[in-house]
Amino acid sequence: MFSIFMATLLHKFWARCYHAWQSLRASLGRPSPKMREERRTEVGEDFLKYVCDAGGSLPRGKMAKVMRCLNLDEATLAAAIGRLALDGMLTVGEQFTLTAKGREAALKLIRAHRIYEQYLAEHSGYAPTEWHQRAHRMEHHISKDEQERYVSLLGNPLYDPHGDPIPTDSLAMAPARHTAQSPLPNTYWRIAHVEDDDADIFQRILQTGLAKDAVIHVLSINGKRFSFRYEGETFQLPTKTLGALDLIPLTADEAHAEWPVETFRLHHLGSHEKARIVGLSPACRGALRRRLLDLGFVRGSRVSVAMHSPMGNPTAYVVRGTTIALRQDQARYILAVPASSEGTQKDEQSSKSKV
């Protein structure tokens, strides 16, 4: 009798556990009304931003592309557009056009996104490939007070890490530094903006070390690839990559005044060689940039190799009387010229983006 009682008790216990587990699974799989409302709001805000980026007006024929870009189905997008129209954010006709109210809301989102992206670039350890998606998630939730704290910390930046202008608190926009110029062989250019919408192309650009404010020397270009000289090294990229770069032309003298012809990345410095630092790469940002500057890797400092580790990485460098070990992925951001190359007074005085 006791065994029957225990069996019945255990059966009821496990049955209750099973039903509790099933209820938990159902609740986890079904978003709450609050979550559904937040999602609807985010979809609408994403569409406002998309229309704003398109110039404030979008033809109906572009809806298939919008659904692909925003990863939405037709019903979800249609519901979002209807809500925006009812809220006075959008006028609906042959084109979807932002009202003044809708444009203001879109610019506030763009401001939140670009401020947070700049914050990630300067004060986080996240890779550049992660900045955009993290900022995209945060733009819907970051408060105005939080934005202002970031702005104060960052020194009121005008541009985000890719070169896109950040709307001011009054939603005024700094001039976009985008250009439509195509490079020719044996010409010099400054990168004003790097587009990160295409993840594959953006990753290829990052692998070369290119970033906003980088100066390149285009060597050759054809239908498939173009080659260029950058920080003492020669690279090749698919020609379509140029579509993600906005370039400002420079003369040879202007380019060499910033970065002398002999410039190389410090991890190439040999055991018995000495060099003079001319700056840090534009791709070096945030905590690493501040650390290298604090360690004495500033323009004009003399540097030599004290010792290579048995595996070649890290390397100990002597700078300003101190021996400092750096990995290759750190030393590559330090740009130098041979110590025998004193440079002209023009080279000595050039700075801008170096430090």
PLM region spans:
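Short alpha-helical segments that sit at the start of domains
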Residues: 17-48
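Short acidic, hydrophobic short linear motifs in intrinsically disordered regions
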Residues: 57-69
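Short amphipathic alpha-helical interaction segments
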Residues: 71-86
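A short, conserved structural fragment
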Residues: 85-95
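Basic, amphipathic "hinge/linker" alpha-helix immediately C-terminal to the N-terminal HTH DNA-binding motif
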Residues: 95-113
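Mid-protein regulatory/catalytic core that forms ligand/cofactor-binding pockets
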Residues: 140-280, 288
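Structural motif
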Residues: 214, 301-302, 322
